[in-house]
Amino acid sequence: MRIILLGAPGAGKGTQAQFIMEKYGIPQISTGDMLRAAVKSGSELGKQAKDIMDAGKLVTDELVIALVKGRIAQEDCRNGFLLDGFPRTIPQADAMKEAGINVDYVLEFDVPDELIVDRIVGRRVHAPSGRVYHVKFNPPKVEGKDDVTGEELTTRKDDQEETVRKRLVEYHQMTAPLIGYYSKEAEAGNTKYAKVDGTKPVAEVRADLEKILG
């Protein structure tokens, strides 16, 4: 089962990716992890990626596709894989298709922007332990304090409203067009496309995914 997850940052993809991986026994493929592994391994592709990144440039689509092809040929991808964060653009989706990387399901996590802002901006973390709270959905017993240690909770830099809104603008400009792209691919019979209501509680979203994926 080969799956692509689409949806804005904060739409709940990460939580459900864990569930899909465990239930269907497939690995999650992150392009960031692949790039780091390639650079560390010192492979030919890794050297190319390192040179580009050291120059402060973005790694080319061709290079990322080559890494994806290599990664999905590995034994743990025999039953499929889960792609999150790639493709991000229509040219990347086209390049995947041309490289013969077919996908069984494209799942779009649909959550309104304002709810995403609410979800992310309300996060508070206890950095030493990694415990995460939310001022509205999962508040600590004492406001601003960790339940276990009583230490101060902080807000991640990435969770500040200005940063979140900027990421949402980027998502709508670059990645949202993929929704139309994969809807057409599904109409042509090349993949299955499903929209998931990401505003529902985690357990309900999970149940919806089980119905879709079988």
Swiss-Prot record:
What is its EC class?
A: transferase
Under SUPFAM superfamilies, the record lists: P-loop containing nucleoside triphosphate hydrolases (SSF52540)
Q: Which InterPro entries match?
A: Adenyl_kin_sub, Adenylat/UMP-CMP_kin, Adenylat_kinase_CS, Adenylate_kinase_lid-dom, P-loop_NTPase
Pfam families tied to this protein: ADK (PF00406), ADK_lid (PF05191)
- The EC number(s) this enzyme carries: 2.7.4.3
Catalysis performed (reactions)? AMP + ATP = 2 ADP
Keyword Nucleotide-binding listed? The answer is yes
Residue numbers binding AMP:
31, 36, 57-59, 85-88, 92, 156, 167
Any single GO molecular-function term of the entry would be: adenylate kinase activity
Pathway(s) where this gene product acts: Purine metabolism; AMP biosynthesis via salvage pathway; AMP from ADP: step 1/1
Report the record's Gene Ontology biological process terms: AMP salvage
Identify the stretch(es) annotated as NMP.
30-59
The UniProt entry lists the main location of this chain as cytoplasm
Protein name (record): Adenylate kinase
Whose protein is this, by species? Answer: Shigella dysenteriae serotype 1 (strain Sd197)
Taxonomy-wise, where does this protein's organism fall, top ranks first?
Bacteria, Pseudomonadati, Pseudomonadota, Gammaproteobacteria, Enterobacterales
| Gene designation | adk
